[in-house]
């Protein structure tokens, strides 16, 4: 078998996770967020596995066009909207919805001639202060969109949470109250909930939920695990041992000689490194799963390899599988060791890592 790393994507896990989220939000439609190459799982892979989703959320127009070219006919929404007037005919021609969050987008809609109107989701800044119109701007912007012949009616309404992944933080309730007060009585769909909203704030679920990371079997909350919500990891990042060697006490290993063995042991070298997207800053003790057990990374992660301490009595051999994260070793656990979030790990794999449906 090829010793180089691969990301094995489970179609059944993706489908299980979609079903679990529907169970969490039975009255809501699901806008499956597949931006950033399906969170590193492969854009078309994910969309084809989640064909029963009600729509797909994307960050960029080229992602939406790739889905249309791949035969996806479901509703598509550009979560950051469009950035050039020349994008608008493409939205019309490919039946792609757009978020409007900035006055420049509103002006382009008003000034462009289109063959038919575009479906718009008006983004309200309810407190994240990143994208969206403030409550003070909202009524004027809404009126201009209503008057614009290039905008399909009704206008849909959305916001995004800043702290929904902190279940004890009341700021999410503040944001919900602001959004609901501002949009009360208006027609159109409403969408507030991301993964954390769908899982932890049921009152936010609205007409559509927009799960991202949870679809891939990962909890959005630090210290939590997707399995606690009936979610199954969709990605298994797998490589192999390409060397097994005896190592003497008091001898270092790796660049910089930062780790020294306290006793005689056996080391394994795994064919994955920062050139594949595995973080160079993974500290000593970060776990890797080899032959049914966790073994710690020792020494510095290099471009193509990392080293693990297999233990004095290890029977592991060259060619044995090494799981960097997956069902047996949750990516949330690995991220916590490294001091990052699971989102970053799954989306930063480089093109050297083969992504394949398993």
UniProtKB/Swiss-Prot annotation:
Primary enzyme class: isomerase
Entry keyword set: Isomerase, Pyridoxal phosphate
InterPro entries, sorted: Ala_racemase, Ala_racemase/Decarboxylase_C, Ala_racemase_C, Ala_racemase_N, Ala_racemase_pyridoxalP-BS, PLP-binding_barrel
Xref: SMART domains: Ala_racemase_C
GO annotation (BP), single: D-alanine biosynthetic process
GO MF entry, a single one: alanine racemase activity
NCBIfam families cross-referenced by the UniProt entry: alr
Role according to the record: Catalyzes the interconversion of L-alanine and D-alanine. May also act on other amino acids.
Family of this protein: Belongs to the alanine racemase family.
Family matches, as HAMAP family: Ala_racemase (MF_01201)
Protein name, as recorded: Alanine racemase
Organism: Shewanella baltica (strain OS185)
Encoding gene per record: alr
């Amino acid at each position: 078998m090829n010793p180089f790393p691969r990301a094995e994507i489970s179609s059944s896990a993706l489908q299980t996770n979609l079903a679990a989220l529907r169970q969490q939000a039975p009255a809501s439609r699901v806008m499956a967020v597949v931006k950033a190459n399906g969170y590193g799982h492969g854009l078309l892979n994910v969309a084809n596995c989640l064909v029963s989703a009600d729509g797909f959320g994307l960050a960029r127009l080229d992602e939406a066009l790739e889905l249309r070219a791949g035969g996806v006919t479901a509703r598509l929404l550009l979560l950051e909207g469009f950035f050039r007037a020349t994008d608008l005919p493409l939205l019309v021609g490919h039946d792609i919805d757009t978020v409007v969050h900035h006055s420049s987008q509103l002006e382009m809609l008003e000034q462009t001639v289109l063959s038919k109107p575009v479906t718009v989701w008006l983004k309200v800044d309810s407190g994240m202060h990143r994208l969206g119109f403030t409550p003070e701007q909202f009524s004027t912007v809404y009126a201009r969109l209503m008057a614009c012949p290039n905008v399909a009616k009704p206008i849909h309404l959305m916001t995004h949470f800043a702290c929904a992944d902190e279940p004890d933080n009341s700021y999410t309730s503040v944001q919900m109250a602001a959004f609901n007060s501002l949009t009360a009585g208006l027609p159109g769909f409403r969408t507030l909930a991301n993964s954390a909203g769908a899982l932890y704030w049921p009152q936010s679920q609205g007409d559509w939920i927009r799960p991202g990371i949870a679809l891939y079997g990962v909890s959005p909350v630090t210290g939590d695990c997707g399995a606690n919500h009936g979610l199954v990891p969709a990605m298994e990042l797998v490589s192999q041992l390409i060397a097994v060697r005896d190592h003497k006490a008091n001898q270092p290993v790796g660049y910089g000689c930062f780790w020294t063995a306290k006793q005689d042991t056996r080391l394994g070298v795994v064919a994955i490194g920062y050139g594949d997207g595995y973080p160079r800053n993974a500290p000593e003790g970060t776990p890797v799963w080899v032959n049914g057990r966790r073994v710690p990374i020792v020494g510095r992660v290099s471009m193509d390899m990392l080293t693990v301490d297999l233990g004095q009595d290890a029977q592991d051999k060259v060619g044995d599988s090494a799981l960097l994260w997956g069902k047996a070793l949750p990516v949330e656990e690995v991220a916590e060791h490294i001091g990052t979030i699971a989102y970053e790990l799954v989306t930063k794999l480089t093109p050297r890592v083969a992504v394949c449906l398993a």
